[in-house]
Amino acid sequence: MKIYLVGGAVRDALLGLPVKDRDWVVVGSTPQEMLDAGYQQVGRDFPVFLHPQTHEEYALARTERKSGSGYTGFTCYAAPDVTLEDDLKRRDLTINALAQDDNGEIIDPYNGLGDLQNRLLRHVSPAFGEDPLRVLRVARFAARYAHLCFRIADETLALMREMTHAGELEHLTPERVWKETENALTTRNPQVFFQVLRDCGALRVLFPEIDALFGVPAPARWHPEIDTGIHTLMTLSMAAMLSPQVDVRFATLCHDLGKGLTPPELWPRHHGHGPAGVKLVEQLCQRLRVPNEIRDLARLVAEFHDLIHTFPMLNPKTIVKLFDSIDAWRKPQRVEQLALTSEADVRGRTGFESADYPQGRWLREAWEVAQSVPTKAVVEAGFKGVEIREELTRRRIAAVAGWKEQRCPKPE
């Protein structure tokens, strides 16, 4: 029996990045031998075991053979005669097909070290094309390592295009697509994930609502980048700088979906695109089974981001109604989330990357004023039933009006 550290732990250590999880491959052993050594078996389809002390995963070396469609149609073979090189060959990218023995020596049968040095994401073998999930994984790796200047090898991108055009991505379940997307949204450069999907044709298949934005013009006065698809990715990039939250980043990604519905004869204007985009947000989220909390914020951002841009022109009643509409009294975090997504929208434009966004500050200040109006005082004043809500709203509007007179500049 020989045990090797494999995959991401080896890769990230070589890149000087923190190692979160460690996976191990066991060569020359059997399930019974592992059980006798105190390991606990957890894999049903192939033998994976948990170490009795560390609880890290130890998998018997195995090979895989395509036996069906999609990413689940594989038959695994695990036996003592499967070599380390056999096991590494089934992996997706050369930088993930690295192993380290107990002496610290790196085993690199597929030039993963060279590709690490050259910052290249390259597939190990043609078997890459048998698993459509790998298209999303490569896009996610490209986003994860974009700050290190990694790029996808030309031949790998070509294979990803072939897989997409062959309809392989249609076998992916919504849950897996969302899981990869969610993971990509946590990276430093999530916009790269969607750009890679567009480069290989997968964006049109998996995210048609986003793909439809490319080629749709916006007024050059407000959008020097002109193309709404480009603006969307720029906005997502800015959101990633402003917030680590997946729901903020996803909502930013979806904020302009309504522009994809504008008839070409009305271009480059997109009047009413915010509310129009709500149904597309719902459509996308229902298809991918996006969690409700993430979906709900995306709907609100699509509907209200343009309203927040015009904050100085809003009367106090409209401002309080906005807080009602986003359910801020029960979910106050939404005020900050809308401020961040709206700021990302404004700064996600060519030449506006460092622009100030006072509307965000005013939104936050108005919220602090409105929510500081005490409900208890209304009740103690003798109001009952529906009158409490009406009086509380009246007092909130009055408080916001007083603040706006002092703090928020009047529109010219």
Curated annotation (Swiss-Prot):
Residues 228-329 form the HD domain. PROSITE patterns: HD. GO terms for biological process: RNA repair; tRNA 3'-terminal CCA addition. It catalyses: a tRNA precursor + 2 CTP + ATP = a tRNA with a 3' CCA end + 3 diphosphate; a tRNA with a 3' CCA end + 2 CTP + ATP = a tRNA with a 3' CCACCA end + 3 diphosphate. Mg(2+) binds at D21, D23. ATP binds at G8, R11, R91, R137, R140. Its cofactor is Mg(2+); Ni(2+). InterPro entries: CCA_bact, HD/PDEase_dom, HD_domain, NT_sf, PolA_pol_head_dom, PolyA_RNA-bd, tRNA_CCA-adding_enzyme. The keyword Nucleotide-binding applies. Its EC number is 2.7.7.72, 3.1.3.-, 3.1.4.-. It holds the Pfam family PolyA_pol. Magnesium is required for nucleotidyltransferase activity. GO terms for molecular function: ATP binding; CCA tRNA nucleotidyltransferase activity; cyclic-nucleotide phosphodiesterase activity; magnesium ion binding; phosphatase activity; tRNA binding. CTP binds at G8, R11, R91, R137, R140. Keywords: ATP-binding, Hydrolase, Magnesium, Metal-binding, Multifunctional enzyme, Nickel, Nucleotide-binding, Nucleotidyltransferase, RNA repair, RNA-binding, Transferase, tRNA processing. It comes from the Bacteria. NCBIfam families: PRK10885.1 (NF008137). Belongs to the tRNA nucleotidyltransferase/poly(A) polymerase family. Bacterial CCA-adding enzyme type 1 subfamily. Catalyzes the addition and repair of the essential 3'-terminal CCA sequence in tRNAs without using a nucleic acid template. Adds these three nucleotides in the order of C, C, and A to the tRNA nucleotide-73, using CTP and ATP as substrates and producing inorganic pyrophosphate. tRNA 3'-terminal CCA addition is required both for tRNA processing and repair. Also involved in tRNA surveillance by mediating tandem CCA addition to generate a CCACCA at the 3' terminus of unstable tRNAs. While stable tRNAs receive only 3'-terminal CCA, unstable tRNAs are marked with CCACCA and rapidly degraded. Monomer. Can also form homodimers and oligomers. Comprises two domains: an N-terminal domain containing the nucleotidyltransferase activity and a C-terminal HD domain associated with both phosphodiesterase and phosphatase activities. A single active site specifically recognizes both ATP and CTP and is responsible for their addition. This is Multifunctional CCA protein. The lineage of its organism: Bacteria, Pseudomonadati, Pseudomonadota, Gammaproteobacteria, Enterobacterales.
